[in-house]
Amino acid sequence: MEIIQKIIKERTFIDPKDGKTKSRFGYRGHNQIAWIIVHYTGDYGSQGCAKKTADAMQTWKRTVSTHYLVGDDAIYQTVKDKHAAWHCPYEKSNKCAASNCVAIGVDLVERKRNPRSHSVKDRDWYFTDKVIQDGAQLVAMLADKYNIPQDHIVRHYDVTGKWCPRPFVGNDTNEITGDIHEIGWAMFKERVRLARRCPDDV
């Protein structure tokens, strides 16, 4: 599996809104990686292109980042595993113990049929088969590398209740795939399990 390294070089930036120094990622300290949290970018303009978001992360003045971006074009790593990306803050982690300091963030880069509407409730956010397949392979590889149990592979939604990744959240039907969103997540998790070294032991 080829992963393009596009590591964010400048950790800190000056927030133009308040003039304060802030960071794009942080340090884990003594915390061990124990979770993988799956997201989508929520950027209707990405249309499956991981490079666009990976490039933007290099300079944007936002306290938001992720370790990996999986797109139709390629897989990018933007934050080293040993560092904490800002993708799921602890103060919002009210459903399980996963958070930035103990998790790896994986963003699947979505497409949207109608980019004029940006609502998370829209049912036309979707992942291509390639993104799902490559994403499952990446998550399986990371889970095996860090000995992460299958039930510690979760959605952003499972941690905070935020509808992310939308193509895998909700009991409504996706307009593109025809699948119920929750079933899409179950199918993705099964792909991950089958791609692991010992699928029957996780």
State what each model feature region is.
Residues 1-99:
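N-terminal catalytic cores of peptidoglycan-degrading enzymes
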Residues 38, 104, 153-155:
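Hydrophobic faces of well-ordered beta-strands that scaffold small-molecule active sites
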Residues 1-14, 30, 97, 109-202:
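Basic/polar, cationic surfaces and motifs that engage anionic cell-wall
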Residues 43, 102-104, 108-114:
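Short connector loops/turns at beta-strand edges and beta->alpha or beta->beta junctions
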